[in-house]
Structure formats: structure tokens, C-alpha cells
From Swiss-Prot:
InterPro entries: Ribosomal_uL6-like, Ribosomal_uL6-like_a/b-dom_sf, Ribosomal_uL6_a/b-dom, Ribosomal_uL6_bac-type, Ribosomal_uL6_CS
Record keywords, A-Z: Ribonucleoprotein, Ribosomal protein, RNA-binding, rRNA-binding
GO BP term, example: cytoplasmic translation
GO MF, one example: rRNA binding
Tagged with keyword Cell membrane: no
Domain of life of the organism encoding this protein: Bacteria
Keyword RNA-binding: yes
Protein name as annotated: Large ribosomal subunit protein uL6
């Protein structure tokens, strides 16, 4: 039995969890999410809690894989419950001279030192806001109820200019620590 998988998930007020044909659907004030669950995992919804257990009747080639599925699907369902009730938020910081970000609806325009600006069309589920204050690095604030989708979008934006180790220029998460390198040491033999 998975250590993560055996923990019950409490359902907050205003959130409903339903199970139909191995698909768990979670509805809440921030939106609706659904996730397929492998038949090797049983899902029980009772007394304001969701519990996942390994299905003893369902056979999988590798028993360790069943333990892995147990923890995986518990984490996915928990992320869905938190997402539709509270939502997820990530902030990206643009570090570099002349780096700018602006948005119009769900389209972000990035000026990252290339000869052209980069336009990124975001999914409808992700809300975006950009902040540019004088003498501060521009920020891109992304919010969504889907943790996986939010992470993928942030990773895609960050991939256009990853932070480099010498000056730290690039797109980084707020609070992320970039491992720095010293430059060439001139004259050292």
C-alpha cells in the first residue's frame, strides 16, 4: 500500500466529487476538472472524504506499478479538489535589461532580447496578469484550477529564456534560486 495513497482526501464545502465509469469529476467554485482512474484503483466517496484503495481483483503485470498508481491517482484527485476550491497561482519574473511582458486577454507578448517579440496564446482555463513597475523586474502572474496545465504553461514560457548562471538573466519563478558561476578568473595560473 502506498504511503501517500492511503491518506484520505477531505472534501471542502462547496465542492462535489462524482465517480462514473472510472472517471472522477470534481466541481467547485473555481471550475470543474475530471481525471481517468486506472481500474486497478478503487475510488470510494463517503462522509465528506475520498479514499483510494488498490483493487485486489484487478491484476497488473508489476505489483509495484499498482502501488505507484495508488499514490499517483491520490495526488491527482487531491490536486483537483484543491484546484476547484482554492485554485493555483504561479509568478514568473523577467530578469534582464529590456525584458518586458504585456498581455491582451489570454495572449502574452514577451520582449526577451531577441530580434522579434514572442506571442503566446494561453489556454482559456489559465488567467494571466502582467505587472511592470519602475526599477523592478516585470512579473507574469498565472492562475488556474488545473495544476498540471498551469505548470505546463509556466514551463513553456520559461523555456523561451531560461536563467543563465553567470548574470542570472532570463525568466525564473519568484523565489527560485539560480545557481551562479563565477566568470573567468583572468591571469590565474
Amino acid at each position: 500500500m502506498s504511503r501517500i495513497g492511503k491518506l484520505p482526501i477531505s472534501i471542502p464545502a462547496g465542492v462535489t466529487v462524482t465517480l462514473k465509469d472510472d472517471v472522477v469529476t470534481v466541481k467547485g467554485p473555481k471550475g470543474e476538472l475530471s481525471q481517468y482512474v486506472n481500474p486497478a484503483i478503487n475510488v470510494a466517496i463517503e462522509d465528506g472524504h475520498v479514499t483510494l484503495t488498490e483493487n485486489e481483483k484487478e491484476m497488473i503485470d508489476n505489483p509495484k506499478q499498482k502501488h505507484a498508481f495508488h499514490g499517483l491517482y491520490r495526488s491527482l484527485v487531491h490536486n483537483m479538489v484543491v484546484g476547484v476550491s482554492e485554485g493555483y497561482k504561479k509568478e514568473l519574473e523577467l530578469v534582464g535589461v529590456g525584458y518586458r511582458a504585456s498581455n491582451q486577454g489570454n495572449i502574452i507578448e514577451l520582449a526577451l532580447g531577441y530580434t522579434h517579440n514572442i506571442f503566446i496564446q494561453l489556454p482559456a482555463e489559465v488567467k494571466v496578469e502582467t505587472k511592470s513597475e519602475r526599477n523592478k523586474n516585470p512579473l507574469i502572474i498565472l492562475e488556474s484550477c488545473d495544476k498540471q496545465l498551469l505548470g505546463q504553461v509556466c514551463s513553456k514560457i520559461r523555456s523561451f529564456r531560461k536563467p543563465e548562471p553567470y548574470k542570472g538573466k532570463g525568466i525564473k519563478f519568484v523565489g527560485e534560486v539560480i545557481r551562479r558561476k563565477s566568470g573567468k578568473s583572468a591571469g590565474a595560473k
